[in-house]
């Protein structure tokens, strides 16, 4: 629905307004068009409400006067949300929505998930009862690492492969109840996302409005509206970032998320003094880059979707990568990117493939102190808006209410927004795990992101 060409054509004058930053990304244009449509619908519904700020015979004009300001703010804010860069954005056309996931299964709909881990080379060479037709045991395929073959050269202990069935056995399949074909199935699972709300209000006196206008040339209602709306949008930005921080799996650990350390002194921690060899700082910083690559590789193994391709980090980690000569800062200047200083900051491209974002709110004051803790989060976001570990689902981005106090007769304004947030159904910490309704996932559970603490950076 939100990809409808007619909706985009309707809002093209707003999307292409010369006084506003250009929205080049086609998906951002589509999502912004849908949000503008939802906003217009909400404003039309509110136009029928009784407003205390004016007589009952003027309620329509009282609210409609605010439409252009609301629409302009939505147009400015929506394309600049960090959600477009680090998670998926799926606008909702109603207060609730469904997310469906199809899983391939062995044997039955409640069987083990298939097409995720390595294919079992012996499964289709058995009958349904599990009898191996190649003469080997039912578990003919063993091992996961071919390197173990070199432990005892000349034998295949610890790493075996199933092979196909003979013609005679294939012809006999199905001739008896105990010799039926091996079977596969699929299951359709769903999780729901429900719109939640944020709300703020502000009050001011008519005397304040008069004095502010006379002395500073400012409109009190406009300034307070900007404050309220900016705060709500900033909070949504931080909710997205902090949710990823909280739910990301522990990095610098094994790929089963059991927090067992792999070649680091402690799981989840990369200590540049002990975990990275080098004669001087730049060589140790390159060791940090190798650890980033390893975590990105684990994401590919854990999701089977792709290698990690974006990083959120503290500024000192980004500086270390830049000093190592692997972070190219120039794209941020050459591409004229719109960097939001109050939200995410695009730093550049790492090794030609990782988009790096600096969190300006990361605690960074004790960077040189003993035991100072820096961090990075590496994650995967595909080219499709459906290919992400977390989904931000805007419904009505901004809704304004105006009223007058019944006792003081002083003006009041309020803003509300509605949106949902849910994790990818496949983001659970184990094969076959599912995300429940309205759930962003438990702590350390989202396999699309990995979080690492970096210590002794200096």
Describe the predicted segments one by one.
Residues 1-19, 247-248, 260-264, 327-329, ...:
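Short, intrinsically disordered N-terminal pre-domain segments
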Residues 92-95, 194-196, 303-305:
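Extracellular/periplasmic catalytic domains that process cell-envelope and extracellular macromolecules
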Residues 89, 98-195:
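Assembly/oligomerization interface modules of large self-assembling protein complexes
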Residues 157, 251-277, 428-439:
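Surface-exposed intrinsically disordered loops and tails
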Residues 108-126, 246-250, 426-440:
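Short linear, low-complexity motifs centered on an aromatic residue
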């Amino acid at each position: 629905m939100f990809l409808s060409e007619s909706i985009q054509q309707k809002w093209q004058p707003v999307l292409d307004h010369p006084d506003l930053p250009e929205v080049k990304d086609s998906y951002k244009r589509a999502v912004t068009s849908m949000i503008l449509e939802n906003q217009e619908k909400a404003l039309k519904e509110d136009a029928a409400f009784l407003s205390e700020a004016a007589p009952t015979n003027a309620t329509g004009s009282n609210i409609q006067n605010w439409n252009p300001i609301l629409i302009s703010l939505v147009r400015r804010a929506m394309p600049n949300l960090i959600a477009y860069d680090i998670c998926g954005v799926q606008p909702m056309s109603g207060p609730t929505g469904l997310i469906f996931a199809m899983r391939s299964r062995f044997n039955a709909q409640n069987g083990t998930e298939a097409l995720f881990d390595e294919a079992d080379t012996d499964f289709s060479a058995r009958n349904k009862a599990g009898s191996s037709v190649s003469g080997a045991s039912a578990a003919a395929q063993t091992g996961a690492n071919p390197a173990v073959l070199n432990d005892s050269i000349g034998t295949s202990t610890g790493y075996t492969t199933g092979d196909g069935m003979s013609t005679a056995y294939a012809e006999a399949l199905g001739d008896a109840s105990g010799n039926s074909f091996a079977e596969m199935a699929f299951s359709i699972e769903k999780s729901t996302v429900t719109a939640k709300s944020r709300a703020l209000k502000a009050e001011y006196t008519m005397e304040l409005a008069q004095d502010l206008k006379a002395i500073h040339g400012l409109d009190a209602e406009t300034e307070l509206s900007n404050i309220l709306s900016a705060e709500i949008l900033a909070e949504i930005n931080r909710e997205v970032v902090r949710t990823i921080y909280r739910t990301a799996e522990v990095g610098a650990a094994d790929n089963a998320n059991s927090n067992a350390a792999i070649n680091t002194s402690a799981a989840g921690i990369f200590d540049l003094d002990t975990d990275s060899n080098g004669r001087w700082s730049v060589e140790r910083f390159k060791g940090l880059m190798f650890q980033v690559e390893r975590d990105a590789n684990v994401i590919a193994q854990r999701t089977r979707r792709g290698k990690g391709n974006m990083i959120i980090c503290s500024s000192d980690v980004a500086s270390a990568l830049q000093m190592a000569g692997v972070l190219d800062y120039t794209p941020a200047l050459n591409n004229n990117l719109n960097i939001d200083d109050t939200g995410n900051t695009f730093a550049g491209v790492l090794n030609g493939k990782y988009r790096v974002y600096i969190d300006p709110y990361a605690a960074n004051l004790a960077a040189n102190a003993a035991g100072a803790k820096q961090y990075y989060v590496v994650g995967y976001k595909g080219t499709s808006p459906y290919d992400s570990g977390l989904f931000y689902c805007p419904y009505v981005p901004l809704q304004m209410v105006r009223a007058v106090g019944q006792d003081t007769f002083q003006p009041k304004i309020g803003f509300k927004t509605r949106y949902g947030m849910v994790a990818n159904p496949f983001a659970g910490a184990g094969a076959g795990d599912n995300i429940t309704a309205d759930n962003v996932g438990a702590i350390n559970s989202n396999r699309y992101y990995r979080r690492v603490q970096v210590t002794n950076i200096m």
